Amino acid sequence: AHKYTPTRYSQVLKNPYRDNWLEAITAELNALNRANALKHHKLIHTDRPITLKWVFRIKFHADGTFHKFKARLCARGFTQKAGTDYDPDRISASVGRASTFMTLLAVAAHERHHLFGFDVKGAYLQAKLKEHVVCRLPPGILATKDSDGLLVLKSLYGLRQSGYNWGQKFAKVLKSLGFHQSRVDPCLFTFHRNTDVLRIATWVDDGMVATSSPALWDELRLKIHAIT
């Protein structure tokens, strides 16, 4: 970790880059608000609140130059209770098989297809949470007169079921656009239009695209972006 990267919220206030970190925290809270991910909640005696943690990171470009200060509010998944806060049978993230990616590359090379990569920003926050999950207020979010906790409405990073929820959400989006999901690897999706073909292999919130038509990917990429 970078020496100026805080490991907890309290260290931010003493950090030489305090203002930059506070700006990153504000950006994260704004993103959570836009996604309607959290809602103020009055804790009651039957609630079993989990805890959240701020995670900080200084991001760099591939050439090593500075990119940005990043703050993310994550759930401490280990504080969740199986069967209550999540279904233990629905926690596997959508991770494509290594053989799927290797085959996709081999087919693309043989057919002279074009390759693209993508990542979905804030992917998990787009997936709704089915379970009733509440949490204690983390540093940076103040209590109100009527609330001393938070109701979690979306799949926060760190929740045991978030990766699974996002995978289900993204698969539904792709199938609504006409993609066919592979029965061999559910992280592989294929789209056909006339003589053109486009294949997507997903790895959680990242993906690789191989297509005979870059224009087709441009079109579908915009449609995916409009839905997600």
Predicted regions span which residues?
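Long, low-complexity, charge-biased intrinsically disordered regions
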Residues: A1-T228
